[in-house]
Amino acid sequence: MIRHALLIFSILVSTPIVGEGATSTYEPTDVFLFNCGDTSNNVDVSGRNWTAENQKILSSNLVNASFTAQASYQESGVSQIPYMTARIFRSEFTYSFPVTPGSNFLRLYFYPTRYGSQFNAVKSFFSVKVNGFTLLNNFSADLTVKASKPQTEFIIKEFIIPVYQTLNLTFTPSLDSLAFVNGIEIVSIPNRFYSKGGFDDVITNVGSSVDFHIENSTAFETVYRLNVGGKTVGDSGMFRRWVSDDEIILSESSGISPIVPDIKINYTEKTPSYVAPDDVYATSRSMGNADHPEQNLNFNLTWLFTVDAGFSYLVRLHFCETLSEVNKEGQRVFSIFIENQTATLEMDVFRMSGGSWIPMYLDYTVIAGSGSGRRHDLRLDLHPLVSINPKYYDAILNGVEILKMNDPDGNLAGPNPDPLVSPDLIPNRATPRIRKNKSHILPITLAVVGSLVVLAMFVVGVLVIMKKKKKSKPSTNSSWCPLPHGTDSTNTKPAKSLPADLCRRFSIFEIKSATNDFEDKLIIGVGGFGSVYKGQIDGGATLVAVKRLEITSNQGAKEFETELEMLSKLRHVHLVSLIGYCDEDNEMVLVYEYMPHGTLKDHLFRRDKTSDPPLSWKRRLEICIGAARGLQYLHTGAKYTIIHRDIKTTNILLDENFVTKVSDFGLSRVGPTSASQTHVSTVVKGTFGYLDPEYYRRQVLTEKSDVYSFGVVLLEVLCCRPIRMQSVPPEQADLIRWVKSNYRRGTVDQIIDSDLSADITSTSLEKFCEIAVRCVQDRGMERPPMNDVVWALEFALQLHETAKKKNDNVESLDLMPSGEVGTTTDGEDDLFSRTTGHVGKSTTTDDSVLVVGDERSGSSWGVFSEINEPKAR
């Protein structure tokens, strides 16, 4: 169930807010409400005073950069103030607000409609910045409103901005567009209100043993603020709106909202009255089933929050024990899970708060998603903790706040959402509605509706008949189809080598036969796309891997189509081969060649170390070389550069002969298509830990992003440990930093996989580490192309085999395609380079010499790829 975050701040301003939280005592030092484009002060329906813009806050280029206009039409539910007037910007325009130093709520009000003949806000795209923070980038208020659920006509964007003297708010129209705003609200908030932590002054970093610290200079965007189990309420201090969670909670596990008699919330110094109003702490959602509490063990209380992937989020949970039957510790205890990770194992509200009707709140931080899509469903689950044998198998929650934190570049902007329905099916809000005579409209409407009903009944009848015929004669044959789909062929004979632009189209009957109707015991892998089954086709003659799209998959049909199109046109010994696909009966299935030896990760992190032997150093090098050649082909062997975007150990497969196959092309992207392009700009997708930091920061994608991910794989191959670990000293927690640190000190041999200590040779290790560390440089321009990576890995293998044969102990060697060897420096990349001159004159610390192809005349060069003489594509 996907609900867009926009519903939170699209509350009808015309509806009076109930339950104002009378006990709120915070009085903000600054409260500004500006009705943009208006020339006089006005009062809105809730009694708040909005002032007209004045010269003190307006930019000096007022006349040239902007103009004001009135909305041509007022939709039902849209209030007069502040939405019926707007300031519209032709060019960059800045408001300057003198405010008291500290953090402030900044709320921007937008009503995308037509404003006279001069401006249609539906076509408006613009950016908004405040004091160095990017709040919105190429923002479309119209697309944002259309994607809201439930549908609204306007949107309020709320931010929290640290201000030291002046709040400078800048609107910048996108190319060939105009910017606009209807209202601006600024409200100061208590010192460190969202940065100090929960009532216990702690911010739990989900998935880490180290608590999180939020700097006072951090900016936030409010994404959700929920009154769990209750109705929409407000508070008088900071004018926040707490929205019902009915649209967010999963319907199948919605629990109950207990009705509690009038109670008094006992606020404390740790949880003062301005944290949340009475109505939030007096209402809640619990699991219920008092007569059969054991049923609560079969499900969770679950909320799904649709957010922008790739950002860090502050999740604030509000609790208050209001059930009179819970009157001592240990009676209602539950666990909190965020993003399927344990946030709090043992949550006892009565014990932690100090008793009944005493509110408390806890703060957590989490990174949402893996950059694999524009949107991500951040998941919150509550489940009874059985291990301590509580009196009630139950859980409770009163309120939720979710705030997005700015990234290292000061960015809070996410991409524009896709509309939930086709724009052609949405009434055009940009055109004022013409009020016609109702006496003419009614008979026309009845006639149209009647015709549509008859037509719909006819279509349904035809579909039912066709479905019955289809069931009586099921399709059992596959066909070969070009992409996009063409006329089916009756040829079902499997081909040894598929044409580059063809793949086999299976019937759902064949797929179910191949997998025993998707039998669970045949599952050999699970990923973001869905489950992968081991199957047999063509009467058991061919083993295949069958990847089935799950309905709840975050990746979905777009990635299905991407992988189908990519792999149907790409053929390489080190790319997994696509045999075919199926898209019948609402199923999306891809069929690949079967990889008996599974993934590289399976062999690095062996489950049964007694029966599964470790990979030798030679085997690891061969696997890495195969994967590198596959990437090299993607980057330089096709018509255009193809960027994989999700290179990791689980996407490197091994066949029966341990030949490497790069897999999973659902996130792949075609790179620059002309010489004038150096990159493509795109939403960040990939897997954290493997994600190129430069790509993450700038959203600029090049083939060097794949190089970074592959470098992380090389480090895993070398050290055989996860990218991030918690049960180690802080300096060892991050694999990349840990290896770089040891690389600088010359102690990499002390952190390699213990299974390699007696197998790996020093010269091979040095060359391998050199190229691996170069791959994971922070700046893309400092990383090598895949041509160089392949060459270096092949050289590392040659050094290993030579040393094994001759039993030499060469301490140092470097080789460059130019025939020159670099001199020693203190930089990371040159730690192992201690030789000078031609490669034929390499000297080592023990005076032994290894001559490898002096002046490229030796035969040893034959073991390397032809990329020693790289040619332009």
UniProtKB/Swiss-Prot annotation:
Gene3D superfamilies, per database record: Galactose-binding lectin, Phosphorylase Kinase, domain 1, Transferase(Phosphotransferase) domain 1
Ranges that cross the membrane: 446-466
Ranges for region Disordered: 472-494, 813-843
Biased composition regions of type Polar residues, renumbered to the chain: 833-843
Signal peptide: 1-21
UniProt domain Protein kinase: residue ranges: 518-803
Membrane topology category: Single-pass type I membrane protein
Domain of life from the UniProt record: Eukaryota
Membrane side Extracellular: residue ranges: 22-445
Amino acids binding ATP: 524-532, 547
Gene Ontology MF term list: ATP binding; protein serine/threonine kinase activity; transmembrane receptor protein tyrosine kinase activity
Glycosylation sites recorded in the entry for this protein: 49, 64, 138, 168, 216, 266, 300, 340, 437
GO BP term, example: response to metal ion
Keywords: ATP-binding, Glycoprotein, Kinase, Membrane, Nucleotide-binding, Serine/threonine-protein kinase, Signal, Transferase, Transmembrane, Transmembrane helix
Family stated for the protein in its record: Belongs to the protein kinase superfamily. Ser/Thr protein kinase family.
PANTHER family in the cross-refs: OS03G0124300 PROTEIN-RELATED, OS04G0586500 PROTEIN
Record-given protein name: Putative receptor-like protein kinase At5g39000
The species this protein was found in: Arabidopsis thaliana
Higher taxonomy: Eukaryota, Viridiplantae, Streptophyta, Embryophyta, Tracheophyta
